[in-house]
């Protein structure tokens, strides 16, 4: 980051672990909630592309949970996005960033690219390690010592012991860890009631847990009782000034060449799928749409009988439509309205769950039918980072554009009829559908498995908003 950029003071820390499954989400979410209860305004962030953890962060902090991903955003955008999240909707006192996987685990073959350590180094943020000691005692200190010296850019500023068996066990481990020069900030007793249940893609979204609010409150109580919050805040305050300027949706659109159309109506409505079946979308998507003059309106495909009044664009993000297939299938009126809107040329972006929802059916349950394709649940997890190529002009990309994205699903979509071209090429393989269902001479439907973060590709938001601004409401 340039030395010419004014320094921003933002206390911050990263919560990481040596491995997956150590309890990062439990500790990070509980820590955010405990700090909030102690009077701090906390900005919650997730390293990596995951949608689920930020939902818990939002419950814990009372503000949007946000992502920081080196692949999706690029190295230079992480600081600006962190500062943006920490200043909206109001200035935060500190930022807590939950890592992904193990501290040094990143893109395969990338030597740690996009790892939590990569994020921590770019943000010059101290790291607090969550160490699962359920099957270890003094050997945990060797793990901490190794993590501390593996990469000299990383400062391990503290350890929180998780799943300790007794006070004696905690004291034994803490003594060994502190002997290698790393302070122990807390020790959490083993408590199965604090675990976050798993879904086939990872954790269960907060929106799907009726008891989520109570669970987060319980986490806050347990963390406050067993972790030294004052010491945690001091770790966050030890982070140096950050040489970056907060990201701006307006500036991002301007840089992408977006210019409001003179004939644009006042704030055209973009219908954004929400509810329990569609929980996966990044906060910056709606912020970019608002900055472009659109009015995002969230609707629930499971229960709403119609699209929002004046819909001129549709955004169907990710989620679990296969889990709620019966409920989605039962909302015949909404499925019909959505199919008619897509076929009439209303600009529509559908990612992963949105792609499935637009199919004719998913595992036999009738869906929207805007695509002549069927979706099926499988046992195989397809995931990875991609630099997607637009093979032709689409609703969100110009021919030849490269856009960063990621996939994460256990389903397949099979075309059962003639479709238009693919939405993207992923490592040379076609993915999704780009089509002109109304025959107006340009693509108005973009449906694929690829998840994109529009802060990292604002040209996608700009193109979509431009199409929406000239669309006649359905």
Swiss-Prot record:
Alphabetic keyword roster: ATP-binding, Cobalamin biosynthesis, Glutamine amidotransferase, Ligase, Magnesium, Nucleotide-binding
GO annotation terms (biological process): cobalamin biosynthetic process
Record Gene3D superfamilies: 3.40.50.880, P-loop containing nucleotide triphosphate hydrolases
Site (Increases nucleophilicity of active site Cys): 451
Residues annotated as the enzyme's active site: 352 (nucleophile)
Record-linked Pfam families: CbiA, GATase_3
Transmembrane segments: none
Catalytic activity, EC: 6.3.5.9
Residue ranges of every copy of the GATase cobBQ-type domain listed in the record: 269-459
Cofactor(s) needed by this chain: Mg(2+)
InterPro entries in alphabetical order: CbiA/CobB_synth, Class_I_gatase-like, CobQ/CobB/MinD/ParA_Nub-bd_dom, GATase_3, P-loop_NTPase
Pathway: Cofactor biosynthesis; adenosylcobalamin biosynthesis; cob(II)yrinate a,c-diamide from precorrin-2 (aerobic route): step 9/10
An example molecular function term from Gene Ontology annotations: hydrogenobyrinic acid a,c-diamide synthase (glutamine-hydrolysing) activity
Reaction catalyzed: hydrogenobyrinate + 2 L-glutamine + 2 ATP + 2 H2O = hydrogenobyrinate a,c-diamide + 2 L-glutamate + 2 ADP + 2 phosphate + 2 H(+)
Main function: Catalyzes the ATP-dependent amidation of the two carboxylate groups at positions a and c of hydrogenobyrinate, using either L-glutamine or ammonia as the nitrogen source.
Note in the entry: The a and c carboxylates of hydrogenobyrinate are activated for nucleophilic attack via formation of a phosphorylated intermediate by ATP. CobB catalyzes first the amidation of the c-carboxylate, and then that of the a-carboxylate.
Family according to the record: Belongs to the CobB/CbiA family.
Record's comment describing the protein's domains: Comprises of two domains. The C-terminal domain contains the binding site for glutamine and catalyzes the hydrolysis of this substrate to glutamate and ammonia. The N-terminal domain is anticipated to bind ATP and hydrogenobyrinate and catalyzes the ultimate synthesis of the diamide product. The ammonia produced via the glutaminase domain is probably translocated to the adjacent domain via a molecular tunnel, where it reacts with an activated intermediate.
Protein name as catalogued: Hydrogenobyrinate a,c-diamide synthase
Organism: Thermobifida fusca (strain YX)
């Amino acid at each position: 980051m340039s030395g010419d950029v004014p320094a921003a003071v933002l206390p911050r820390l990263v919560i990481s672990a040596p491995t997956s499954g150590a309890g990062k989400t439990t500790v990070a979410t509980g820590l955010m909630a405990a700090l909030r209860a102690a009077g701090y305004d906390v900005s919650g962030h997730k390293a990596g592309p995951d949608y689920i953890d930020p939902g818990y962060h939002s419950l814990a902090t009372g503000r949007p949970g946000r992502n920081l991903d080196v692949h999706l955003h690029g190295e230079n955008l992480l600081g600006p996005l962190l500062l943006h999240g920490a200043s909206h909707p109001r200035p935060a006192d500190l930022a807590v960033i939950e890592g992904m996987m193990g501290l040094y685990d990143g893109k395969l073959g990338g030597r740690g690219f996009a790892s939590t350590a990569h994020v921590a180094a770019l943000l010059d943020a101290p790291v607090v390690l969550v160490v699962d000691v359920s099957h270890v005692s003094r050997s945990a200190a060797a793990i901490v010592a190794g993590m501390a010296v593996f990469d000299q850019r990383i400062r391990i500023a503290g350890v929180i012991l998780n799943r300790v068996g007794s006070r004696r066990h905690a004291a034994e481990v803490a003594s060994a860890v502190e002997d290698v020069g790393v302070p122990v900030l807390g020790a959490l007793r083993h408590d199965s009631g604090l675990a976050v249940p798993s879904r086939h893609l990872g954790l269960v979204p907060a929106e799907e847990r009726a008891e989520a609010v109570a669970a987060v409150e319980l986490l806050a109580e347990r963390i406050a009782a067993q972790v030294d919050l004052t010491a945690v805040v001091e770790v966050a305050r030890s982070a140096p000034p950050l040489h970056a300027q907060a990201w701006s949706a307006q500036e991002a659109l301007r840089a992408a060449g977006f210019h409001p159309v003179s004939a644009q109506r006042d704030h055209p409505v973009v219908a954004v799928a929400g509810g329990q079946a569609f929980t996966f979308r990044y906060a910056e998507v709606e912020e970019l749409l608002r900055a472009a003059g659109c009015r995002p309106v969230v609707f629930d495909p499971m229960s709403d009988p119609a699209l929002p009044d004046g819909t001129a664009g549709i955004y169907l993000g990710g989620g679990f439509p296969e889990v709620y297939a019966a409920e989605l299938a039962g909302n015949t009126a909404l499925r019909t309205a959505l199919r008619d809107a897509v076929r009439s040329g209303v600009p529509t972006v559908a990612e992963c769950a949105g792609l499935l929802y637009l199919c004719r059916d998913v595992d036999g349950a009738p869906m929207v039918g805007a695509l002549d394709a069927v979706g099926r649940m499988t046992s195989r997890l397809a995931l990875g980072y991609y630099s997607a190529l637009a093979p032709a002009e689409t609703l969100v990309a110009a021919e030849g554009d490269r856009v960063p994205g990621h996939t994460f699903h256990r389903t397949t979509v099979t075309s059962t009829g003639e479709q238009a071209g693919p939405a993207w090429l992923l490592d040379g393989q076609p993915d999704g559908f780009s089509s002109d269902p109304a025959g107006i001479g340009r693509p108005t439907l973009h449906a694929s498995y690829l998840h994109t973060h529009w802060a990292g590709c604002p040209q996608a938001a700009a193109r979509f908003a431009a199409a929406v601004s000239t669309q006649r409401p359905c």
